[in-house]
C-alpha cells in the first residue's frame, strides 16, 4: 500500500506538472481510495488532492469570490462580464511568473476588456516588492493581493500549490483551459 500511495501521488503530481488534464480527470473519477490506502493521514491528503482535481477540472465552474484590488476597487469574479477571464496566480519571487506577467501585455487591451479580462492574484507577502514590480511595467488589468502568500483566502479557495497557475474561464466562469505556458494560453485564445 505504501508503494501504491507513493506511485499514485507521483503520477498525479507529474500529470499536473505537464498539464495532462484528461489523465488526471480519469484517475480522479476512477480511483477508489477506500480499497487502496492504509495510512489515514496519507489517504486524507490524496482524497483532498483528488477532490481538488475534480473541482477544478476543465468544464467545471470556479468558485466565486469578492475582494478589493490594489487600487481599492471592489471586485467580484462573477460580475466580470468579459467573454473570457484569465485568472492567474503568480508572485514576484517566482521567475516563471515574472517572465509570464509581462507577456500577458501582448494579449490584453483595456479597451477590449469585454473580450478578455485578466485577474492577477499575487501570492506576495511584501507590498513593496509587488508594487515595485507592477510599477516597472504596464499591467492595467485587475491586480489582487492580500499579502498572505499561500495562506491567502483566494489562493486556498482555488487550492493553488504552484505558481504560475492559470485558469482561462468562459463568461459563465467555467474552466475552458488550464494553460501551463503563455504559448498554450495564446493557442486557446486565438
Give the location of each predicted region.
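Thiol/disulfide oxidoreductase modules built on the thioredoxin-like
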Residues: 139, 148-189
Amino acid at each position: 500500500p505504501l508503494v501504491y500511495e507513493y506511485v499514485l501521488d507521483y503520477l498525479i503530481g507529474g500529470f499536473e506538472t505537464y498539464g495532462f488534464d484528461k489523465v488526471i480527470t480519469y484517475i480522479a473519477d476512477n480511483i477508489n481510495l477506500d480499497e487502496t490506502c492504509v495510512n489515514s493521514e496519507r489517504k486524507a491528503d490524496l482524497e483532498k488532492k483528488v477532490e481538488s482535481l475534480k473541482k477544478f477540472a476543465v468544464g467545471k465552474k470556479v468558485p466565486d469570490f469578492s475582494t478589493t484590488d490594489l487600487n481599492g476597487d471592489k471586485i467580484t469574479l462573477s460580475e466580470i462580464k468579459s467573454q473570457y477571464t484569465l485568472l492567474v496566480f503568480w508572485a514576484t519571487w517566482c521567475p516563471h511568473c515574472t517572465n509570464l506577467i509581462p507577456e500577458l501585455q501582448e494579449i490584453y487591451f483595456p479597451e477590449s476588456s469585454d473580450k478578455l479580462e485578466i485577474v492577477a492574484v499575487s501570492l506576495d507577502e511584501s507590498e513593496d516588492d509587488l508594487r515595485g514590480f507592477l510599477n516597472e511595467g504596464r499591467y492595467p488589468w485587475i491586480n489582487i493581493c492580500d499579502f498572505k502568500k499561500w495562506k491567502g483566502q483566494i489562493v486556498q479557495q482555488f487550492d493553488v500549490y504552484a505558481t504560475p497557475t492559470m485558469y482561462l474561464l468562459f463568461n459563465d466562469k467555467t474552466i475552458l483551459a488550464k494553460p501551463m505556458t503563455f504559448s498554450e494560453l495564446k493557442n486557446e485564445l486565438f
